Amino acid sequence: MDKYKFKQVDIRLKLSQAKPLYSTEQITTAQKAVEVMAEYLSERDREYCCVVNMDAANHPINFNIVSIGDTNHTPVPMQNVFKSAILSNAASILILHNHTGRSLTPSTFDVDMTLKMVKAGRLMNIPVLDHVIVAGSTYDRCFSFKEQEPDLWNERIYP
């Protein structure tokens, strides 16, 4: 037994209690989410994907830039989407990403990724409230998967 000696390392994570960084407003619609996050997603030269971690009353706890891609795609690793939600003890999450052009049309990848995230959120009991695509510089328009593709949240269709 003395042949192997291991050093035990204790690691602890602590979230500091600070004032909200960007909003204390309740987010109940896709447009409200865009208003809150516009300054972080506007005028980007490539696609960004971010997650807003929400408390039980749909107030933002914090947000996390999950990935930065190129001009027409950003990879979205599932573990990165839920990591900050778990560490923040979030009750739910909201996913947003930008399209660098003016098109709000979701790609096949966007649809597939949304479905995977909704299913993963169900498994972890951290619901995905919506996945919102924004485009252009004013962000007066957005594409809400929850509003436009509600079947993605239907467990009977997508168990």
Residue ranges and their predicted role:
Residues M1-L15, S23, K32, A57, ...:
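Active-site-proximal loop/helix of nucleotide/amide-processing enzymes and allied scaffolds
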Residues Y22-S84:
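Glycine-rich, small/polar surface segments that engage phosphate groups of diverse ligands
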